[in-house]
Structure formats: C-alpha cells, structure tokens
Amino acid sequence: MAKIIGIDLGTTNSCVAIMEGNTTKVIENSEGARTTPSIIAYQEDGEVLVGASAKRQAVTNPRNTLYAVKRLIGRKFTEKEVQKDIDLMPYTIAAAENGDAWVEVRGNKLAPPQVSAEVLRKMKKTAEDYLGETVTEAVITVPAYFNDAQRQATKDAGRIAGLDVKRIINEPTAAALAFGLDKHNDGKGGDRKIAVYDLGGGTFDISIIEIADVDGEMQFEVLSTNGDTFLGGEDFDQRVIDYIIAEFKKEQGVDLSKDVLALQRLKEAAEKAKIELSNSTQTDINLPYVTADASGPKHLNIKLTRAKLEALVEELIERTIAPCRTAIKDAGVSTSQINDVILVGGMTRMPKVQEKVKEFFGQEPRKDVNPDEAVAVGAAIQGQVLAGDRKDVLLLDVTPLSLGIETLGGVMTKMITKNTTIPTKFAQTFSTADDNQPAVTIKVFQGERELASGNKMLGEFNLEGIAPAPRGMPQIEVSFDIDANGILHVGAKDKGTGKENKITIKANSGLSEEEIQKMVKDAELNAAEDKKKLELVQARNQADAMVHSVKKSLAEHGDKLDAGEKEKIESALKDAETALKGEDKAEIEAKTEALMSASQKLGEKVYADMQAAQAAAGAAAGGGEAPAAEATASKPADDNVVDAEFKEVKDQK
C-alpha cells in the first residue's frame, strides 16, 4: 500500500517524513540535507530551481528568487501585512484580478499556492527517490492560527503539486504527536498537559494540548491555540538588515536599502549572523564590494554582538507572550499545570527566546525535540493513522478562530466559537429584516471582533425564493460544518419552502477550480519539459565524453591508421561537434552513435598497442621468473604445512 507522507511546508525550510513500521524517518533530499530551503528561483531559460540551488543563486537573481511566500498564501493584496512585505521583498508582489496577493516573476503573475507547489513537488520527489515508488497522498501542516482561506490555499498547493492532501494538520499539534509518541515509546508516557511554542520563519503559534491514555489509546486533545501568522524569523532577519543599513549609512554615507543586489547579500549575511549568535556572543559581518560610488568600491565590516541582536528583536520576542497568555486562559489552566514546554521552529534556538519562554512558563523548555523535524514527523504519524495502519492514536484538534455570519446592524453573530474541537456542526435559525424579503445574503466571517467588518470575510452566498411574509416570520436555518481539515461548509435552508443553498467556503478570493486545474496541467507539462531537458543534458554529456575520448585517442594513435579511416573519424567528429551545438536530442544521439561506429578501428588500434605495451613491460620486469612461479604452483600441496603468524627476530650477537 502506498505511503501517506508527512510534509512540513515551512516559510523558511520544509521537511518530509514517513513512517516505517512504528519508526519515523525524516528523508534526506538530493543534496543530503534533512530540510530544504523553501526558496524557488525562475531562470531565464524557463528552468525552476528549488531549495539549496535556488538559494545559492539568489544574490545574482534577486527579482526572480522567491522566499517566504507562505506569508502571502491565502491573503488579500490590500492587507496591511502584505503591504509591509511589498517594501521589504526584492521580488514584486502584485494584486491579482480577484484581489489576492500574487507574485510577479519574469512578466508572469503567479499565485502563492502555485509557487508553494514547487516546494511540495520537491518534497514529493525526495520521498519518491527514497521509497522507489510514486507518492500521491500527503498530510501537510499549517500554522495553527491559519484562517480558512490560508488552509484552502495550502490544500490547493498540494493539488497543484500532484498530491491528494488527506489532511491539513496544525503544526503545534503535529509536534505534540511526535513528542507524545516518542515519550510513550520510551515508557515515560502517562497523562500530561503540554505547551507547544512554535516560532518559525514566518509564523508564530502556541497550543496547549492534553495527552491522555484512554483505554490503551493515546488521545491528543488541543485545549486552545493562539498565535500570529505574520511573526517569525524573517522579521528577526529584517531587524538585523535595518541595523546594518543604518550603520553602513553612518560610516559610508551610502544607503543600501535601494540596492537590490546588496539587499540580497545583506539578507544572507543577517540570517547567518543571527544563527551564529545562538552559539557565540559576537560575530563579524563581512561583505567586500557590497556597493560602489564615484570614489570606488565600498566594503562592509560590522561587528554584531548577541546583546545588540537581543536589543534589536526584544519587541518581537515580547509579541509572542500575549498569545501565550491568551492560550493559557482559553485552555482553563495555569502555567503551573503545564508538564512540558516543547519548542518548535528554528527561531527557538535563540537563547533569548528560550529565556523568555522559561520566564513565562516557570520551567525549562525541553531540548530533546528537534525543532526543525518534529512537525514533519507528526504529519507522518497522522498519515499512518489516516491510512489505517495505526489504531492507537486519536487526535482532537480545534478551530483557531470564531466563525459566524453578519446579522442586522453589521453585528458578527458567532456560530462556532474559537477553540471548538473539530470536526463539528452547528445550526441556528434566523429570519428576515424586511417585509416580503425574497432573498437573504449570508456573509460568513472569521475572527473575534464584535462587528463583522472587523473580521475576515470568508465568503457569501444567497438563499433565494423566500415566500413573501412579514419581517421576522420566515424561518431560515443556517448551518456551519467544519471538517477535520478545519475547512468550513455553510448551508442555509428556508424551513417554510424547503429551499436550500450550500457552499464550501473558498474565501471571497482564492483560486477557482479552473485555475487550479490549469496550474495542475502546467505543472504536469513542466514535469514533462524537465524530463526532456534532463534527457537532452544526458545525451549531450555522453556525446561530449565520446568526442573528448576520440580526439585524445586520435592524437595519440591516429598515425597508425590509414588516411581513409582517419578521414572518416574526423568527419564523424565534426558532425558530432555540430550536433552538440544544437538542441536536438535525437540528432546528438545519432551522431554519437555514428562517431562510436567510425572510431571502432581506432579503438582496436589503441587496444592492440596497450596489449603490446603490457606484454613488453611484463617480459622486461619478470625476466625468467615467471616459469619458476608456474612450476611452484604446480607442485602438490604439503599436507603438513600449516598457516602460522610469524615475526622477524634479529640474531643476538
């Protein structure tokens, strides 16, 4: 049976894991790394690079290298978080026709799910290379605080990548699964409440989760969740970049903020410095030839201490504490009732973050969970549960934000409150606001504000054909149904006429089914195109090697061939070199074959010369000893001879 893989689609890095029996396995990518940078580069020749190769060329191709695209997924262009990123990113963020935030690369507008699909495709390929079979199903993780639109967009990305997304699972919940089963397997299980503090590259989540043993089954119940989907390592990097720009301007009088190439180098240097300062107290940021002016090239050399870094990002770390406070309150527990604090996400390696977490929860956070891999591992465990290969795990997740509809006066009437265990259903009866009202518009919102306008509108639909009646008389039942992925389905039914209308909330933006299908087809075409390119490269390499080999042999042994043979080989060589300049794979292969055939006689000459040279060398070195060796070998074995170890002992004189 095909495996359901677990994918942590991260803002900065992504990771893929599978279950092998009851053991989890994080799969290394083609570069041998267990995590892959979530970076995608679009080359001039149409090639798409993903991961480390995309990261390596970012400095020379900043406008067409996309990173942190997860921050845009499922968002509108007008949202303040998106507007903030427009000024910071070297690539172009543009408004799509439906109002979504898209990116523009080489004159083409791309939807964030389409870009994220490239990373998912790399994860899929990584798993397929390891398993030796096609992978079609996956569990993909999202930040717990992702809204409906962001979850839908992530699911769409999976479809575009050729994956059937069996479940969207919250990142902290996945980490709790990995932690809980690990502790259960080492015999240190039992009922416990844990806090998962997840500070990644672009998002922050906090979840309070209860792990209980119920009749031999491990039950993971999320008590509450909170967070900020626009707070993470990228923001920490930006603080360092801003500091470097300010210092350089003070020293050199040059503003680097308008230099796209310099900014890309600064980003790389800032990230490196931030990571180094988790293990050392000071680091040097050295960027020779960072820019130039009329006086010549400028070099950047700045010392950054851990204390300075902590001062720069203190406010960002502090911003994670308010959601922690809310999550504890919503869960109905106190910090003293938390048994374990789990750190997830690369940013939790920062000593100041660990210190802040310890200060809030009153205990040392655990260090035995890999912050980069735990989420993918948890997703793989959930995949095993969904495949029916594991029966001892039950996961009870929650919806992170309240869901409701707009009622008279623009009020948000909550249908499902935040932190409700999912899947769940809820129905409530409403009526009309005007006499003889023939239709009602159901506007669906997500958020905690009292007025609907302060929340995120997810979608709207009409229920038409209401029988004429005084206001307040018609009975309209509105039902909300959240599935296990946290995706919402809404229905409205006129109890009087029996008329009803239902929608799966796709947000009032998002990708249409046709757009998704087109992107799936484009992805398949790209895969076929990539295969063609690979085959062409292989044919070219083979031809190149053949040309080189024949040229070398011709230079060394060509004088032993008659003129006709030599001319034939030289002609075939010329044809092969001409074919190599083109893009026709069949032509390259045909000319390589012809060269191979034409150079057969040359090969025979080379082989004959080698044999003769070896025979001559053997005769010169061996002299008359060879027959003696043969004679020795033919003597019968002495039955009394035994194998023994010996050591040389010098005579004592």
Curated annotation (Swiss-Prot):
Stated role: Acts as a chaperone.
Organism: Methylibium petroleiphilum (strain ATCC BAA-1232 / LMG 22953 / PM1)
Record protein name field: Chaperone protein DnaK
Gene field: dnaK
Induction cue: By stress conditions e.g. heat shock.
Pfam families: HSP70 (PF00012)
Region span, Disordered: 613-653
Disulfide bonds: none
Modified residues (Phosphothreonine): 203
Family label: Belongs to the heat shock protein 70 family.
Gene3D superfamilies hit by this protein: 1.20.1270.10, 3.30.420.40, Actin, Chain A, domain 4, Substrate Binding Domain Of DNAk, Chain A, domain 1
Basic and acidic residues bias (residue ranges): 644-653
GO MF annotation: an example: ATP-dependent protein folding chaperone
Keyword vocabulary terms for this entry: ATP-binding, Chaperone, Nucleotide-binding, Phosphoprotein, Stress response
